[in-house]
């Protein structure tokens, strides 16, 4: 486990998979996230399991943490959105793990999830 603040993380072309999620979340281990980054702007596309298609738009902070909004269409045809902050950890094998705290817009539901980088 390494401190991610000692080096700048570039999330461009990284893929992430869910390893844990709160009960009120809709993503799971079958959901795959494809990240892109330009300067401090982050965006991603995700899908799989209960998610037909989702997008993320946000910022990479100086400490490598992420702040973003997400929205997706789920398998029930509902559009859902929310906000998330993610704190990175560099794992011993060099992959990135993100600890996420999120909330749904317009609802009093909050949760936490963890995603890990998937190597090609």
Label every model-predicted segment.
Residues 48-53, 72-76, 102-108:
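Short, solvent-exposed aromatic-acidic interface loops
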Residues 60-96:
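Mid-chain, well-packed structural core segment of small domains
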Residues 18, 42-44, 66-70, 96-101:
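Short hydrophobic/aromatic-rich beta-strand segments that constitute the beta-sheet cores
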Residues 2-27, 98-104:
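Tryptophan-anchored aromatic micro-motifs
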Residues 13-50:
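N-terminal first-folded block
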Residues 30-36, 55-59, 82-89, 115-118:
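Hydrophobic/aromatic beta-strand elements that line small-molecule binding cavities or substrate pockets
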Residues 2, 29-30, 103-120:
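Edge beta-strand at a domain terminus
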């Amino acid at each position: 486990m390494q401190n991610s603040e000692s080096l700048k993380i570039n999330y461009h072309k990284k893929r992430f998979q869910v390893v844990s999620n709160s009960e009120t979340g809709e993503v799971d281990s079958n959901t795959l996230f494809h990240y892109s980054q330009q300067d401090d702007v982050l965006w991603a596309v995700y899908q799989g399991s209960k998610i037909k298609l989702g997008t993320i738009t946000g910022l990479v902070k100086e400490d490598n943490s992420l702040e973003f909004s997400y929205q997706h269409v789920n398998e029930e045809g509902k559009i859902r959105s929310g906000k998330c902050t993610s704190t990175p950890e560099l794992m011993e094998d060099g992959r990135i793990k993100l600890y996420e705290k999120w909330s749904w817009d317009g609802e009093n539901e909050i949760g936490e999830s963890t995603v890990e980088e998937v190597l090609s």
